[in-house]
């Protein structure tokens, strides 16, 4: 265990247009090679497409999608008496949201389609309806945790 002090939690500033920390977090995960303005442009375009398709508040759809994908338990590999076991662990809210965003964006990148904007739109809509590859990933992890719950004490 480290003897150093625990680092301070960084405060994430909300984005300018929607005043939402979640939007800023998603944009940070979406960004590649430091191109934040491109990531913002893509995500704002995704939000406008969601608004056109559903005629609902796009932030509510995004929040619902992230909450649907957010895992409650994950499995971590632990070495126990000479063999490696998958040990289920409960997940904090912030870590769960980060995992959900990562899984949704990974599912977007796997999708077949023309643009990343349309792929993100479809994946967020699917996740808000409890379908799609990100939900499948969450269910897979939950099944693995359920199967290995005997090792939860490690």
UniProtKB/Swiss-Prot annotation:
Keyword check for Manganese: no
KW Cell membrane (keyword) present: no
One MF annotation (Gene Ontology) recorded for this entry: rRNA binding
Domain of life: Eukaryota
SUPFAM superfamilies, per the entry: Ribosomal protein S7
One Pfam match: Ribosomal_S7
Sorted UniProt keywords: Chloroplast, Plastid, Ribonucleoprotein, Ribosomal protein, RNA-binding, rRNA-binding
Location in the cell: Plastid, Chloroplast
Family of this protein: Belongs to the universal ribosomal protein uS7 family.
Oligomer status and interactors: Part of the 30S ribosomal subunit.
Function, as annotated: One of the primary rRNA binding proteins, it binds directly to 16S rRNA where it nucleates assembly of the head domain of the 30S subunit.
Protein name (record): Small ribosomal subunit protein uS7c
Organism: Pleurastrum terricola
């Amino acid at each position: 265990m480290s003897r150093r002090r625990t680092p301070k939690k960084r405060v994430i500033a909300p984005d300018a247009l929607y005043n939402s920390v979640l939007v800023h977090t998603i944009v940070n995960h979406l960004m590649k090679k430091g191109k934040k303005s491109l990531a913002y442009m893509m995500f704002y375009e995704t939000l406008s497409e969601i608004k056109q398709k559903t005629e609902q508040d796009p932030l509510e759809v995004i929040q619902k999608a992230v909450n649907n994908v957010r895992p409650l338990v994950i499995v971590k590999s632990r070495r126990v008496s000479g063999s490696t076991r998958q040990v289920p662990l409960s997940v904090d809210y912030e870590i769960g949201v980060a995992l959900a965003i990562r899984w949704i964006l990974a599912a977007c990148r796997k999708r077949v389609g023309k643009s990343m904007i349309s792929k993100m739109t479809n994946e967020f809509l699917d996740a808000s309806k409890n379908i799609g590859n990100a939900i499948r990933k969450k269910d897979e992890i939950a099944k693995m945790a359920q199967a290995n719950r005997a090792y939860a004490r490690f």
